[in-house]
Regions:
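General helical structural elements
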Residues: 6-7, 69
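Bacterial N-terminal signal peptides
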Residues: 7-15
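Ser/Thr-rich, low-complexity intrinsically disordered terminal regions
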Residues: 17-153
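Positively charged n-region of N-terminal signal peptides that target proteins for export
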Residues: 1-4
């Protein structure tokens, strides 16, 4: 029960940290590892998909992947009534908060898309079902990779 309350508090805190009026969809889980180990494993997993570090602190990892020209063309074609976008990136943020005394870390993940448009920057939150499913799968794979490796040692 205590873990559930602490985990819920971590999710609520991560929404406050974001500062948005609307709460973006997030995926959250507890991982029994140090923040450094979680960050290292996340980068090892996601660098294969073209992600690089955009921002790094003790409690947050933000990584991004530049859109391909095909993705940009497809987006601009699909949204032809809007102005064209360029220099788009998928941005994945992991917020890492310690939970209790058993070295568990609450990992909260959310995904945004950032594009240059109309002389400024536009940000879209990954709130569709496909994005949420991707985050759930990615976080589950990250947890399995870390905790599975710990059990083998």
């Amino acid at each position: 029960m205590r873990r559930s309350l602490v985990a819920m508090a971590a999710v609520l805190l991560s929404c406050v940290i974001g500062g948005a009026n609307e709460k973006p969809p997030v995926v959250q889980d507890l991982i029994h590892a140090t923040p450094a180990k979680i960050k290292k494993a996340a980068l090892a997993m996601l660098v294969l998909d073209g992600y690089t570090v955009a921002y790094y602190t003790a409690s947050q990892l933000r990584i991004s992947r530049q859109w391909s020209s095909e993705e940009t063309i497809r987006f601009n074609t699909h949204h032809w009534t809007n102005g064209p976008v360029s220099n788009c990136q998928h941005v994945l943020t992991l917020i890492l908060l310690p939970v209790g005394l058993d070295q568990a870390i609450s990992v909260t993940m959310h995904r945004d898309t950032v594009c240059h448009a109309d002389g400024g920057w536009k940000i879209w939150t990954g709130d569709n079902e496909k994005d949420v499913q991707w985050m759930q799968t990615t976080l589950a794979n990250l947890k399995a990779k870390i905790e599975g490796a710990d059990q083998r040692h």
